[in-house]
């Protein structure tokens, strides 16, 4: 089965809602399982539970069929997203434009390559969909 991973902020920002809406559309179109991911940064000291994340998503979109909710802890959002995508065997990762910029900066530091989508496709063997902010 196709696997879609979408990282979001909690509480859901406007851009996270737009990114999540696109991920839900892709998952429904592909008959895919959707993993909604939030990353708790150690340095922020905040803890979000999976039930809080699920409740926020369902308040905005209603029940999402075939959805899984994950919360990871880490120092870097990018690293946690890569780990979740690899662990889930993601076929598609849907990220917001702001996240793409952060990923791009991280990749430049690591491999001096500004093409984050090509990097992720190579590393994760998946499609990357970037949702522009409106």
Q: Where are the model-predicted features located?
A:
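Charged helix-capping and loop-helix junction motifs
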Residues: 20, 50-54, 109-116
């Amino acid at each position: 089965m196709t696997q879609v991973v979408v990282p979001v902020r909690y509480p859901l920002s406007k851009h996270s809602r737009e990114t999540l809406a696109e991920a839900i559309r892709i998952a429904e179109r592909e008959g895919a399982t959707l993993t909604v991911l939030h990353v708790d940064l150690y340095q922020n000291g905040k803890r979000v539970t999976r039930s809080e994340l699920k409740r926020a998503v369902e308040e905005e979109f209603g029940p999402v069929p075939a959805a899984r909710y994950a919360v990871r802890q880490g120092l870097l959002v990018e690293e946690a997203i890569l780990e979740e995508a690899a662990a889930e065997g993601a076929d598609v990762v849907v990220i917001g434009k702001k996240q793409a910029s952060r990923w791009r900066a991280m990749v430049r530091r690591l491999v001096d390559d500004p093409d984050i989508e090509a990097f992720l496709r190579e590393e994760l063997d998946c499609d990357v969909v970037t949702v522009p902010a409106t």
